[in-house]
Swiss-Prot record:
Organism: Mus musculus
Protein name: Cysteine and glycine-rich protein 2
Domain LIM zinc-binding: 10-61, 119-170
Keyword Metal-binding: yes
GO cellular component: nucleus
Function description: Drastically down-regulated in response to PDGF-BB or cell injury, that promote smooth muscle cell proliferation and dedifferentiation. Seems to play a role in the development of the embryonic vascular system.
Placement of sequence motif Nuclear localization signal: 64-69
Residues with N6-acetyllysine modification: K112, K131, K137, K161
Superkingdom assignment: Eukaryota
Oligomeric and partner information: Interacts with KAT14. The LIM domain 1 is necessary and sufficient for this interaction. Interacts with GLRX3.
Subcellular locations according to the entry: Nucleus
SUPFAM superfamilies, sorted: Glucocorticoid receptor-like (DNA-binding domain)
Keyword Cell membrane attributed: no
Amino acid sequence: MPVWGGGNKCGACGRTVYHAEEVQCDGRSFHRCCFLCMVCRKNLDSTTVAIHDEEIYCKSCYGKKYGPKGYGYGQGAGTLNMDRGERLGIKPESAQPHRPTTNPNTSKFAQKYGGAEKCSRCGDSVYAAEKIIGAGKPWHKNCFRCAKCGKSLESTTLTEKEGEIYCKGCYAKNFGPKGFGYGQGAGALVHAQ
């Protein structure tokens, strides 16, 4: 005889999950509204979930919490760690003394909370939520593109020349070595006698 009113228990809140609101993951059931990252509380789906010891995370938080750590294992811009590679025999650079800069913005708010830096491409103010640092300078996310082809860049995929940023392909075409045997790939080399 069937048990009426029963259902699986939610893996997050422990209450009964009915079929219309059920999300299944790793053999467990969740309410749609409970299927959230344990750290940032972002909504998850089958393409964004990562599981560790029966806890669910978005891929970004999972990588920060359980991913590889140490020299050479960055998870992209903004998640750099402080391992300087001393165990590998790499000698750390001596720390440079802090030199305060003069902020030309004289508003009391800007002096107290920091004025907005200027984007290296368009010259407009760049605020923290939209700022990317590349080649040591601030950029808007939309301005952080190759100066030649307009391709969107990441801090690890850019090259810089004379204050401008380029994708590796455009940099090689425009500023790389020139002459016989360069720039066409190994299949285009010709042996002339």
